[in-house]
Amino acid sequence: MAVGKNKGLSKGGKKGGKKKVIDPFSRKDWYDVKAPNMFQTRQIGKTLVNRTQGQRIASDYLKGRVFEVSLADLQKDIDPERSFRKFRLIAEDVQDRNVLCNFHGMDLTTDKYRSMVKKWQTLIEAIVEAKTVDGYLLRVFCIGFTAKDQQSQRKTCYAQQSQVRKIRARMTDIINNEVSGADLKQLVNKLALDSIAKDIEKSCQRIYPLHDVYIRKVKVLKKPRFDISKLLELHGDGGGKTSEAVVSAEGAVVDRPEGYEPPVQEAV
């Protein structure tokens, strides 16, 4: 080893060696994520975002975030028929520390979907695009399987292609009628209760008995122009109020008209 002075050590090491460690969470704020009033659980969690600094507004970074929640958590229900459905909610607006979400899609869990696919039966699937009354364009995926006759000794329960076409046409008609005759809130209630799939299963019994009929997935393809009043109505904050409630220093609620200005005092 060469004998000599270490210039780096004699000058105190590298420049900027001692840096101040800043906790990244000190620059972030927590926001409550709110689900629409069509679900029993309104607060579904919290989300982090960097605090507003200059032109970087925190609400702009929150809008567009998608949250995936199980239907069992949204409805406070331990029924296993609800646990495998996942609803997607998208953040559309921010009020104070509340992130207001709207419906953005639905899906089944992977384990449930794979457990339904079995041998000796026919899989029937229909994909339908329909528009709700309030202007949401949705793509709905429906799935069903042929059921085995209990009195038959046959191992298989395959349907003929003519029967498959009839069942698929019946699925398409029912989904079109249910979606086009309801707004988004009514449609979400139907998806939560699984009423569309039950109607399809009941209607197709004469063609061929079915089982495990589900609305497998729902995608939102197109939305109407954003309206804050409709979003507040979904969250139970609308209703056309003409006055706002103001809390005084003593804690009492005082109703004052919109645009109220306090009188000018002569002396302070």
Curated annotation (Swiss-Prot):
Please give the InterPro entries that the UniProt record associates with this protein. Answer: Ribosomal_eS1 (IPR001593), Ribosomal_eS1_CS (IPR018281), Ribosomal_eS1_euk (IPR027500)
GO cellular component terms, A-Z:
cytosolic small ribosomal subunit
Tell me which stretches of the chain form a coiled coil.
Answer: none
Tell me where in or outside the cell this protein is found: Cytoplasm
Is the keyword ATP-binding assigned to this protein? no
Location, primary (coarse class) = cytoplasm
The protein's assembly and partners:
Component of the small ribosomal subunit. Mature ribosomes consist of a small (40S) and a large (60S) subunit. The 40S subunit contains about 33 different proteins and 1 molecule of RNA (18S). The 60S subunit contains about 49 different proteins and 3 molecules of RNA (28S, 5.8S and 5S).
Name of this protein: Small ribosomal subunit protein eS1
Identify the species of origin. Answer: Drosophila willistoni (Fruit fly)
